[in-house]
Amino acid sequence: MTKQHAYTREDLLRCARGELFGPGNAQLPAPNMLMVDRITHISDVGGKYGKGEMVAELDINPDLWFFACHFEGDPVMPGCLGLDAMWQLVGFYLGWQGNPGRGRALGSGEVKFFGQVLPTAKKLTYNIHIKRTISRSLILGIADGTVSVDGREIYSAEGLRVGLFTSTDSF
């Protein structure tokens, strides 16, 4: 696979089908759980820690599935979906680096929600700053991330942890 520095929605759907990094390796979830429409920038240098960064986006429209059920009469995107998107991106980063295995979110440090995503919003922007990657018998990515809606930061997460596993039998 040639390392690109940006990915389209079609590229991300190929990743969801297991076609981007190869069989048994990092995959994104399929829609509806795919919470990213495009990756506009990915690099293994730069970012807050100088070890890599990603910028990705999700287009918001009132027809997105979660607005119909969360909450009736008070539609708002569940904050956990923004958190999951950041884990999705850390896993993608590990696969992009050429690491083998299937991705699993392993936790995070502090998570803060200080805003909301309403159906009137236009775009979410995810910023991921890689703190550390381990690529030995254990494949692990640790990152900090933020989510912004229409340019205003609304969520932050420190110490996002994602691992890649060649066997998930012990889970």
Swiss-Prot record:
Organism superkingdom: Bacteria
Biological process, per Gene Ontology: unsaturated fatty acid biosynthetic process
Biological or metabolic pathway of the protein: Lipid metabolism; fatty acid biosynthesis
One GO molecular-function entry: trans-2-decenoyl-acyl-carrier-protein isomerase activity
InterPro entries assigned to the protein according to its UniProt record, in alphabetical order: FabA (IPR010083), FabA_FabZ (IPR013114), HotDog_dom_sf (IPR029069)
Active-site residue list: H70
Subcellular location: Cytoplasm
Reactions catalysed, as given in the entry: a (3R)-hydroxyacyl-[ACP] = a (2E)-enoyl-[ACP] + H2O; (3R)-hydroxydecanoyl-[ACP] = (2E)-decenoyl-[ACP] + H2O; (2E)-decenoyl-[ACP] = (3Z)-decenoyl-[ACP]
Record keywords, A-Z: Cytoplasm, Fatty acid biosynthesis, Fatty acid metabolism, Isomerase, Lipid biosynthesis, Lipid metabolism, Lyase
Cellular component, GO annotation: cytoplasm
The EC number(s) this enzyme carries: 4.2.1.59, 5.3.3.14
Classification via Gene3D superfamilies: Hotdog Thioesterase (3.10.129.10)
Assembly and oligomerization: Homodimer.
HAMAP family: FabA
Main function: Necessary for the introduction of cis unsaturation into fatty acids. Catalyzes the dehydration of (3R)-3-hydroxydecanoyl-ACP to E-(2)-decenoyl-ACP and then its isomerization to Z-(3)-decenoyl-ACP. Can catalyze the dehydratase reaction for beta-hydroxyacyl-ACPs with saturated chain lengths up to 16:0, being most active on intermediate chain length.
Family, similarity comment: Belongs to the thioester dehydratase family. FabA subfamily.
Protein name per Swiss-Prot or TrEMBL: 3-hydroxydecanoyl-[acyl-carrier-protein] dehydratase
Species name: Azotobacter vinelandii (strain DJ / ATCC BAA-1303)
Designated gene of the protein: fabA
